[in-house]
Amino acid sequence: IPLSTGKEYVKIGDIDYINQVKSKYGIPLDKKYIFSLCNLDPRKNLIFSIKNFLRFVEKNNLDNFIFVLGGSYFKDFENILNENIENLGEKKDKILKIGYVDDEDMSALYSGAEMFLFPSLYEGFGIPVLEAMKCGLPVICSNTTSLPEVIGDCGIKINPYSDSEMLSAMEKMYFDRDFREKCIIKGIERSKLFTWEKCVDVISETINEDLQFGK
Protein backbone atom coordinates (compact mmCIF):
# COMPACT_ATOMS: atom_id res chain seq x y z
CA ILE A 1 0.00 0.00 0.00
CA PRO A 2 1.56 3.34 -1.03
CA LEU A 3 1.88 5.70 1.94
CA SER A 4 2.69 9.41 1.96
CA THR A 5 4.01 12.20 4.18
CA GLY A 6 2.80 15.54 5.47
CA LYS A 7 2.61 18.51 3.12
CA GLU A 8 5.25 20.29 5.21
CA TYR A 9 8.00 18.24 3.53
CA VAL A 10 9.39 20.52 0.82
CA LYS A 11 12.78 21.56 -0.52
CA ILE A 12 13.98 24.65 1.36
CA GLY A 13 16.29 27.13 -0.34
CA ASP A 14 16.65 29.64 2.50
CA ILE A 15 20.23 29.04 3.66
CA ASP A 16 19.86 31.28 6.71
CA TYR A 17 16.86 29.26 7.89
CA ILE A 18 18.65 25.98 7.24
CA ASN A 19 21.63 27.21 9.27
CA GLN A 20 19.33 28.27 12.08
CA VAL A 21 17.90 24.76 12.28
CA LYS A 22 21.35 23.19 11.99
CA SER A 23 22.53 25.29 14.93
CA LYS A 24 19.54 24.14 16.98
CA TYR A 25 20.80 20.55 16.67
CA GLY A 26 24.47 21.34 17.10
CA ILE A 27 25.44 20.76 13.47
CA PRO A 28 28.54 22.87 12.69
CA LEU A 29 27.82 25.45 10.00
CA ASP A 30 31.25 24.98 8.43
CA LYS A 31 30.71 21.26 7.84
CA LYS A 32 28.98 19.35 5.07
CA TYR A 33 26.93 16.42 6.28
CA ILE A 34 25.48 13.14 5.16
CA PHE A 35 22.15 12.47 6.84
CA SER A 36 20.33 9.46 8.21
CA LEU A 37 17.01 9.72 10.03
CA CYS A 38 15.18 6.68 11.35
CA ASN A 39 14.11 4.75 14.40
CA LEU A 40 17.48 3.60 15.65
CA ASP A 41 17.24 -0.19 15.77
CA PRO A 42 19.43 -2.99 14.33
CA ARG A 43 17.47 -3.47 11.09
CA LYS A 44 18.34 0.09 10.04
CA ASN A 45 21.93 -1.07 9.46
CA LEU A 46 23.44 2.03 11.04
CA ILE A 47 26.80 0.54 11.94
CA PHE A 48 27.17 -0.36 8.25
CA SER A 49 26.35 3.25 7.32
CA ILE A 50 28.85 4.70 9.79
CA LYS A 51 31.63 2.35 8.70
CA ASN A 52 31.20 3.20 5.04
CA PHE A 53 30.80 6.91 5.66
CA LEU A 54 34.22 6.86 7.33
CA ARG A 55 35.70 4.91 4.42
CA PHE A 56 34.21 7.48 2.03
CA VAL A 57 35.66 10.54 3.77
CA GLU A 58 39.05 8.94 4.43
CA LYS A 59 39.55 7.65 0.90
CA ASN A 60 38.59 11.01 -0.62
CA ASN A 61 40.20 13.30 2.00
CA LEU A 62 36.89 14.97 2.86
CA ASP A 63 37.84 16.41 6.23
CA ASN A 64 34.92 18.83 6.26
CA PHE A 65 32.27 16.07 6.33
CA ILE A 66 30.31 14.67 9.27
CA PHE A 67 27.62 12.00 9.52
CA VAL A 68 24.44 13.28 11.19
CA LEU A 69 22.23 10.62 12.71
CA GLY A 70 18.74 11.57 13.87
CA GLY A 71 15.94 9.54 15.36
CA SER A 72 14.57 7.90 18.48
CA TYR A 73 16.47 5.09 20.13
CA PHE A 74 15.79 1.51 21.10
CA LYS A 75 17.63 1.44 24.43
CA ASP A 76 19.48 -1.86 23.99
CA PHE A 77 20.68 -0.92 20.52
CA GLU A 78 21.62 2.58 21.64
CA ASN A 79 24.19 1.05 23.98
CA ILE A 80 25.62 -1.05 21.14
CA LEU A 81 25.70 1.95 18.80
CA ASN A 82 27.37 4.17 21.40
CA GLU A 83 30.00 1.51 22.06
CA ASN A 84 30.78 1.25 18.35
CA ILE A 85 31.10 5.02 18.06
CA GLU A 86 33.35 5.25 21.12
CA ASN A 87 35.61 2.57 19.65
CA LEU A 88 36.27 4.82 16.66
CA GLY A 89 38.71 6.89 18.73
CA GLU A 90 39.37 10.29 17.15
CA LYS A 91 37.05 9.41 14.27
CA LYS A 92 34.05 9.50 16.60
CA ASP A 93 34.05 13.30 16.23
CA LYS A 94 32.78 12.78 12.67
CA ILE A 95 29.58 11.13 13.96
CA LEU A 96 26.91 13.43 15.39
CA LYS A 97 23.84 11.94 17.05
CA ILE A 98 21.10 14.56 17.30
CA GLY A 99 18.29 12.39 18.67
CA TYR A 100 14.64 13.15 18.03
CA VAL A 101 13.98 15.79 15.36
CA ASP A 102 10.92 18.03 15.63
CA ASP A 103 8.56 17.71 12.66
CA GLU A 104 8.90 21.38 11.73
CA ASP A 105 12.70 21.02 11.45
CA MET A 106 12.90 17.96 9.24
CA SER A 107 12.64 19.70 5.87
CA ALA A 108 15.50 22.05 6.73
CA LEU A 109 17.77 19.20 7.83
CA TYR A 110 16.97 17.17 4.73
CA SER A 111 17.49 20.23 2.51
CA GLY A 112 20.84 21.07 4.06
CA ALA A 113 22.43 17.63 3.62
CA GLU A 114 24.55 16.25 0.78
CA MET A 115 22.82 12.86 0.59
CA PHE A 116 20.56 10.55 2.57
CA LEU A 117 21.62 7.03 3.59
CA PHE A 118 18.98 4.39 4.26
CA PRO A 119 20.50 0.89 3.83
CA SER A 120 17.76 -0.74 5.90
CA LEU A 121 17.59 -4.53 6.00
CA TYR A 122 13.80 -4.57 6.07
CA GLU A 123 11.07 -1.97 5.54
CA GLY A 124 7.30 -2.13 5.33
CA PHE A 125 7.43 1.07 3.26
CA GLY A 126 10.27 3.50 4.03
CA ILE A 127 8.73 6.90 4.74
CA PRO A 128 12.10 8.64 5.44
CA VAL A 129 13.15 7.89 1.85
CA LEU A 130 10.00 9.60 0.57
CA GLU A 131 10.54 12.55 2.93
CA ALA A 132 14.09 13.00 1.64
CA MET A 133 12.94 12.86 -1.98
CA LYS A 134 10.27 15.49 -1.33
CA CYS A 135 12.91 17.77 0.17
CA GLY A 136 15.27 17.44 -2.78
CA LEU A 137 17.82 15.25 -1.01
CA PRO A 138 19.31 12.45 -3.16
CA VAL A 139 18.96 8.99 -1.64
CA ILE A 140 21.07 5.87 -1.36
CA CYS A 141 18.96 2.99 -0.04
CA SER A 142 18.73 -0.79 0.03
CA ASN A 143 17.61 -2.82 -2.95
CA THR A 144 15.42 -4.92 -0.65
CA THR A 145 11.77 -5.23 0.39
CA SER A 146 9.65 -2.13 -0.33
CA LEU A 147 12.40 0.42 -0.92
CA PRO A 148 12.91 -0.09 -4.69
CA GLU A 149 9.19 0.62 -5.20
CA VAL A 150 9.53 3.90 -3.31
CA ILE A 151 12.71 5.24 -4.88
CA GLY A 152 12.24 3.91 -8.42
CA ASP A 153 15.12 5.20 -10.58
CA CYS A 154 15.51 8.43 -8.60
CA GLY A 155 18.52 7.43 -6.52
CA ILE A 156 20.95 4.57 -5.98
CA LYS A 157 19.90 1.15 -4.70
CA ILE A 158 22.56 -1.04 -3.09
CA ASN A 159 23.00 -4.44 -1.51
CA PRO A 160 22.80 -3.51 2.22
CA TYR A 161 25.56 -6.01 3.02
CA SER A 162 28.04 -4.77 0.39
CA ASP A 163 30.67 -2.30 1.56
CA SER A 164 31.95 -1.83 -1.98
CA GLU A 165 28.49 -0.97 -3.36
CA MET A 166 27.87 1.55 -0.59
CA LEU A 167 31.23 3.25 -1.07
CA SER A 168 30.80 3.42 -4.85
CA ALA A 169 27.28 4.82 -4.45
CA MET A 170 28.44 7.56 -2.10
CA GLU A 171 31.27 8.55 -4.45
CA LYS A 172 28.90 8.59 -7.43
CA MET A 173 26.32 10.68 -5.60
CA TYR A 174 28.85 13.23 -4.33
CA PHE A 175 31.31 13.62 -7.20
CA ASP A 176 28.96 13.26 -10.18
CA ARG A 177 27.07 16.52 -9.74
CA ASP A 178 25.00 16.10 -12.92
CA PHE A 179 23.80 12.70 -11.74
CA ARG A 180 23.07 14.11 -8.28
CA GLU A 181 20.98 16.92 -9.76
CA LYS A 182 19.01 14.45 -11.89
CA CYS A 183 18.28 12.39 -8.77
CA ILE A 184 17.02 15.52 -6.99
CA ILE A 185 14.70 16.55 -9.82
CA LYS A 186 13.38 13.04 -10.47
CA GLY A 187 12.96 12.38 -6.75
CA ILE A 188 10.81 15.46 -6.23
CA GLU A 189 8.63 14.49 -9.19
CA ARG A 190 8.31 10.85 -8.12
CA SER A 191 7.38 11.85 -4.58
CA LYS A 192 4.25 13.50 -5.98
CA LEU A 193 2.94 10.04 -6.91
CA PHE A 194 2.59 9.13 -3.24
CA THR A 195 -0.49 10.78 -1.72
CA TRP A 196 -2.79 9.93 1.15
CA GLU A 197 -5.68 10.05 -1.33
CA LYS A 198 -4.08 7.25 -3.33
CA CYS A 199 -3.46 5.31 -0.11
CA VAL A 200 -7.16 5.56 0.80
CA ASP A 201 -8.18 4.48 -2.71
CA VAL A 202 -5.97 1.38 -2.59
CA ILE A 203 -7.29 0.39 0.84
CA SER A 204 -10.89 0.92 -0.30
CA GLU A 205 -10.33 -1.19 -3.42
CA THR A 206 -8.77 -3.97 -1.34
CA ILE A 207 -11.67 -3.97 1.12
CA ASN A 208 -14.22 -4.05 -1.71
CA GLU A 209 -12.39 -6.94 -3.40
CA ASP A 210 -12.31 -8.88 -0.13
CA LEU A 211 -16.02 -8.29 0.44
CA GLN A 212 -16.86 -9.43 -3.08
CA PHE A 213 -14.64 -12.48 -2.73
CA GLY A 214 -16.35 -13.36 0.54
CA LYS A 215 -19.82 -13.37 -0.98
What are these regions (language model features)?
Residues 1-215:
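Carbohydrate transferase catalytic cores enriched for Leloir-type hexosyltransferases
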